[in-house]
Regions:
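Serine/threonine-rich, low-complexity intrinsically disordered segments
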Residues: 5-7, 22-24, 59
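Short acidic/polar mixed-charge low-complexity motifs
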Residues: 26-29, 53-55
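Short beta-strand-centered aromatic/proline hotspots
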Residues: 28-36
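A short beta-strand micro-motif
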Residues: 19-24, 48
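A generic structural motif
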Residues: 36-39, 52
């Protein structure tokens, strides 16, 4: 059995849950649902939901931090 040795992201992660953000400045809006699983290179994948379609997928924690809040 493989053990995950990656630290959990910043405790401020809880503040992201429920946030509505966009992919870059002009991208589609998405809602951050929560932590999903470890990703590549020390990153984590977060569960997100596309606002317009309801589709759920995973997205990089680092990218979420860089994406702007939806207006």
């Amino acid at each position: 059995m493989e053990t995950n040795t990656q630290p959990v992201p910043d405790p401020a992660l809880a503040e992201l849950i429920g946030a509505i953000k966009t992919f870059g400045e002009f991208g589609e809006p998405y809602e951050v649902l929560g932590l999903s699983r470890p990703g590549a290179e020390g990153d984590w994948l977060m569960k997100i939901r596309m606002v317009k379609t309801g589709e759920e997928t995973e997205y990089s924690y680092r990218h979420i931090l860089d994406d702007p809040e939806a207006i």
